[in-house]
Design a protein with these regions (language model features):
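Conserved sugar-transfer catalytic core signal across GT-A, GT-B, and GT-C glycosyltransferases
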Residues: 75-76, 109
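Short beta->alpha connector loops at strand-helix junctions that form conserved
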Residues: 62, 91-93
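Conserved N-terminal beta1-alpha1 strand-loop-helix module at the mouth
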Residues: 1-75, 81-82
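Expand to "…catalyze enediolate/carbanion chemistry for C-C bond making/breaking, isomerization
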Residues: 1-9, 81, 85, 93-120
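Short beta-strand segments at enzyme active-site cores
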Residues: 40-41, 90, 120
Length: 120
């Protein structure tokens, strides 16, 4: 059985800036292989500002279970892909506690993410 490579996730929550994007991408670009898999999950507004490097991946902190439509403030899976995300955090305890996300919604989000090609 092949051993899984460790995954290090940096969830920025509602923090960060364009300066931090630059600092983080500069620091990550000089790291030497082999590394654990690195996943950076900044606020969605910063996703497209990260340069595309092979030594890390980008993720979003949330996404809508809806594909398109009049859902003010929501972000679709396709929008995340366009912004450069390969992953998305779904079912985080803060979303459950603060926004009342239930298993049915989380299940739908997982399905939408996988169907779109995102890794939940």
């Amino acid at each position: 059985m092949r051993q899984r490579k460790p995954l290090v996730v940096a969830n920025w929550k509602m923090n960060g800036s364009l300066d931090l994007v630059q600092q983080m991408s500069d620091a990550l670009s000089v790291l030497k292989q082999p590394l654990p898999d690195i996943l950076i999950c900044p606020p969605v507004i910063f996703l497209s500002y990260f340069p595309k490097h092979a030594n890390y991946k980008l993720g979003a902190q949330n996404m809508s279970e809806q594909l398109v439509g009049a859902f003010t403030g929501e972000i679709s899976a396709d929008m995340l892909l366009t912004a450069g995300a390969t992953h998305v955090i779904i079912g985080h305890s803060e979303r459950r506690a603060l926004y009342g996300e239930l298993d049915a919604v989380i299940s739908q989000k997982v399905k939408v993410a996988v169907d779109a090609g995102l890794t939940p």
